[in-house]
Amino acid sequence: MKPLVKLFLLFCLVGIVLSRPMPEDEEPVAEGGDDDASGESEGEEETTDDAGGDGGEEENEGEEHAGDKDAGGEDTGKEENTGHDDAGEEDAGEEDAGEEDAGEEDAGEEDAEKEEGEKEDAGDDAGSDDGEEDSTGGDEGEDNAEDSKGSEKNDPADTYRQVVALLDKDTKVDHIQSEYLRSALNNDLQSEVRVPVVEAIGRIGDYSKIQGCFKSMGKDVKKVISEEEKKFKSCMSKKKSEYQCSEDSFAAAKSKLSPITSKIKSCVSSKGR
């Protein structure tokens, strides 16, 4: 603005000078003044040129400032664009992170499904193994049952136990009051029935084969014992001693029990083969 003010003041001074009347006797002076005026005019022109130069410089400076502003705007735009780019990159990063999270979730679900599938397969395998074990156990149980059945059919000890129990049941003499007679008859049963019968069954393993051989043994033995009891009472009524009467019964019972044992031994020998 200062060059413009100077220029305006200069024009005002020139106008004032030119508006003043020039005296005739002072023409040379006027001429000199003209020269001065022309010099002043030239000075004014130079000043104008200087002002123009200054104005050009100012214009150039304004243009430079404007350029700087434009450059600043461009920089600002670049910064804004950079901000947008950064924001876009952040959005892209978030999208990538979201995709990664989604991928991880999908992978986790797949792993969980695989684990469940493996567990189910393991459960199926365990079930099949249990089933095989159960079936194996069932087979073993059947085999054991068959073995037990076979052992029962071929168990001489079982045959012995059943025969002895039957002899104890059918050859009891505990009901006899006389101690002498009871002891005498018990000795006869032991020597004539129990021992020979046990020897007869030997190693027979299937008791059912010889079970019929003992069907009448109890009845036959009881008949002999009953007869000897009657004879013993008859002997005692004759004023004989108890010992003597028991000895008589002992000899008679022995001869009556032998046929019973012979019949059993013959039956066992034929059926036990």
UniProtKB/Swiss-Prot annotation:
Disulfide bonds: C213-C267, C235-C245
Basic and acidic residues bias spans: 63-86, 146-158
Domain of life: Eukaryota
GO cellular component terms attached to this protein's record: extracellular space
Protein localization: Secreted
Function: Modulates blood feeding of female mosquitoes on vertebrate hosts. Inhibits collagen-induced platelet aggregation in the host via preventing collagen interaction with its three major ligands: glycoprotein VI, integrin alpha-2/beta-1 (ITGA2/ITGB1) and von Willebrand factor (VWF). Prevents collagen-mediated thrombus formation in the host. Binds to host collagens but not to laminin, vitronectin (VTN), fibronectin (FN1), von Willebrand factor (VWF) and fibrinogen. Influences cytokine production and populations of circulating leukocytes. (Microbial infection) Reduces replication of dengue virus type 2 at inoculation site and viremia levels on day 2 post-inoculation. Promotes production of pro-inflammatory cytokines, such as GM-CSF (CSF2), IFN-gamma (IFNG), IL5 and IL6, in the lymph nodes of mice infected with dengue virus type 2. Increases the number of circulating eosinophils in mice infected with dengue virus type 2. Decreases the number of circulating monocytes in mice infected with dengue virus type 2.
Disordered, as annotated region: 20-160
Entries under Gene3D superfamilies matching the protein: 6.10.140.1890
Keywords: Allergen, Disulfide bond, Hemostasis impairing toxin, IgE-binding protein, Platelet aggregation inhibiting toxin, Secreted, Signal, Toxin
InterPro entries in UniProt: Aegyptin-like, ALL3/gSG7_salivary-like_helix
Organism: Aedes aegypti (Yellowfever mosquito)
Additional notes on this entry: Protects mice from collagen- and epinephrine-induced thrombus formation in a murine model of lethal pulmonary thromboembolism.
Subunit architecture: Monomer; exhibits non-globular elongated shape in solution.
Name of the molecule in the record: Aegyptin
GO molecular-function terms, A-Z: IgE binding; toxin activity
